[in-house]
């Protein structure tokens, strides 16, 4: 998407965020044309092509017709509300620039941001008051659907915590370094406002994300997109926390050594020798809170759980807030050990907040639930059992490509062609294959799938411009069959009326350019930072996104974001 397109989308969303007039198709179309003409007149930018204009209209549709309702929560009764009174007195500079960032850069609509505003207000009010003199230890849990916006919620919460005078923020990601780096990058863009890599190396202030909106406000990064916590770096960048006026954030893996190093550094340089506490209010957010954080042994505190607790007790005023889509381990902690009875573990004793998903979210209940609106997509298939049984050993291998996997590959090919036809060439597209937890089996599957994809690519390259004659070849006839079975019906489906649909002939004409860049990679054994290198493709001269078939197991199961995930 060009800068002109982004500016038009951002301007329209910003103006409409304060409007109460109902949005219509005609209004969107007129506003796009007015802004396009104005930019051409005032700044000399070329007017949009019909394809670019349609891309802008599609983006505005996606933003303006989505809303999120507020969530629901349960809490203990002794907590005193404090946040709304504090909010009226405090500056809201961190939240204000995050709000503008969501509007102008992420193209959220005003209603959705307003609901996020209300939701984060409610969660803030469930935390302790950072300005109170008395100490506190609050523990809570936020529950949301998979990939439904939990990250945006806790980034919003962190911005509001900074406005409310929280001085130390610790954000725990999963156990994988790639996930930590992804989360750090989002914090750079959504809260810190600076490139943390340049900041920790003292190479100057490079504005990113919210920093481009208001460079006068920033969080202080101790970790970066290149490095987890390091005591030497922390001492060089921060020194003593009490001497830093900006809120300081640590983005950490859930790793025993990392947690111990941070605890040791905090204790050595920041603790009050009299109270044996750090007298700064702290918010600890535990993303994927059911992963590695919960105690799994009766009277033996597990390493990660112990590390988190040791961080919490360092601070006189502290909050622990877990975020998860699978809360069972957290909610059903059995306080049957002496340790849990004495220290309460990380059980969310103070509140549980259930986040609502956006109304355009399609999750498990929309497909598998009773009377599910998308249940018609379900098909029963067990052909993979003959190729690689669900219960298998690390010595086993994928014997052949089952029909269902071939259909999934064909669907991914078609999806790439459709997105190119819609003008989304710059968008990343990913397909996930997760059918074994054994690395040896995953690597073998990668080779088999890669060989199959290369054969299809070769045939498509040779014949995609031969019209209907191409259908005599296996790859074309199979992909056309998948198009007829799964894609053709959407043209007449009212749920997809706003989308632009394409005939098989149109898809075939662009099929090879769309799929020629597809790569098959194994994601395992710590190679995710190298193999999920979306950032490198964003900086490439042709600005074409990564098109990837990711084969993996446990590494793909825990929080890693697969950009543009189309097919699983």
Model segments located where?
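Walker A/P-loop
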Residues: 136-154
């Amino acid at each position: 998407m060009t800068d002109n397109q982004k500016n038009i989308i951002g301007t329209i969303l910003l103006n409409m965020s304060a409007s109460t007039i109902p949005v219509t198709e005609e209004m969107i179309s007129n506003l796009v044309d007015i802004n396009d003409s104005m930019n051409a007149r005032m700044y000399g930018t070329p007017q949009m092509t019909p394809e670019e204009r349609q891309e802008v209209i599609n983006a505005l549709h996606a933003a303006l017709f989505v809303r999120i309702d507020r969530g629901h929560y349960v809490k203990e009764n002794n907590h005193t509300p404090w946040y709304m009174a504090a909010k009226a007195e405090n500056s809201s500079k961190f939240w204000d620039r995050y709000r503008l960032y969501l509007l102008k850069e992420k193209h959220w609509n005003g209603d959705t941001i307003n609901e996020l505003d209300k939701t984060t207000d409610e969660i803030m009010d469930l935390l302790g008051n950072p300005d109170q003199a008395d100490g506190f230890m609050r523990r809570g849990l936020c529950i949301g659907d998979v990939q439904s916006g939990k990250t945006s919620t806790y980034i919003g919460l962190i911005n509001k915590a900074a406005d409310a005078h929280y001085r130390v923020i610790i954000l725990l990601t999963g156990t994988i370094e790639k996930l930590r780096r992804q989360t750090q990058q989002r914090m750079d863009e959504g809260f810190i406002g600076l490139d943390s890599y340049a900041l920790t190396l003292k190479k100057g202030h490079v504005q990113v994300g919210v920093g481009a909106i208001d460079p006068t406000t920033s969080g202080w990064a101790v970790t970066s997109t290149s490095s987890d916590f390091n005591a030497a770096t922390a001492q060089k960048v921060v020194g003593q926390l009490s001497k830093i006026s900006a809120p300081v954030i640590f983005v950490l893996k859930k790793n025993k050594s990392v947690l111990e190093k941070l605890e040791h550094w905090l204790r050595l340089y920041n603790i009050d020798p009299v109270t044996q506490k750090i007298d700064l209010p702290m918010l600890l957010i535990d993303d994927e809170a059911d992963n590695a954080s919960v105690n799994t042994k009766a009277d033996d505190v597990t390493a990660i759980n112990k590390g988190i607790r040791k961080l919490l007790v360092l601070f006189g005023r502290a909050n622990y807030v877990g975020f998860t889509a699978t809360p069972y381990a957290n909610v059903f902690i059995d306080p049957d050990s002496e340790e849990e009875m004495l220290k309460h573990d990380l059980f969310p004793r103070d509140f549980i907040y259930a986040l609502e998903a956006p109304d355009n979210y399609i999750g498990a209940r929309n497909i598998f639930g009773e009377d599910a609106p998308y249940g018609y997509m379900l098909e029963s298939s067990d052909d993979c059992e003959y190729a690689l049984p669900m219960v298998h050993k690390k010595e086993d291998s994928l014997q052949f490509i089952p029909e269902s996997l071939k259909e999934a590959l064909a669907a991914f090919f078609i999806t790439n062609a459709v997105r190119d036809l819609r003008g989304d060439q710059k968008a990343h597209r990913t397909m996930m294959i997760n059918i074994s937890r054994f690395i040896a089996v995953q690597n073998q599957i990668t080779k088999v799938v890669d060989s199959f994809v290369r054969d299809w690519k070769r045939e498509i390259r040779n014949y995609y411009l031969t019209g209907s004659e191409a259908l005599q070849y296996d790859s074309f006839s199979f992909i056309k069959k998948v198009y007829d079975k799964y894609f053709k019906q959407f043209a007449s489906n009212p749920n997809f009326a706003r989308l632009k649909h394409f005939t098989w002939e149109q898809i075939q004409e662009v099929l090879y350019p769309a799929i020629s860049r597809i790569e098959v990679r194994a994601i395992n054994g710590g190679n995710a930072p190298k193999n999920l290198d979306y950032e490198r493709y964003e900086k490439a001269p042709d600005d074409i996104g990564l098109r990837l078939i990711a084969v993996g197991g446990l590494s793909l199961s825990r929080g890693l974001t697969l950009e543009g995930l189309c097919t699983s």
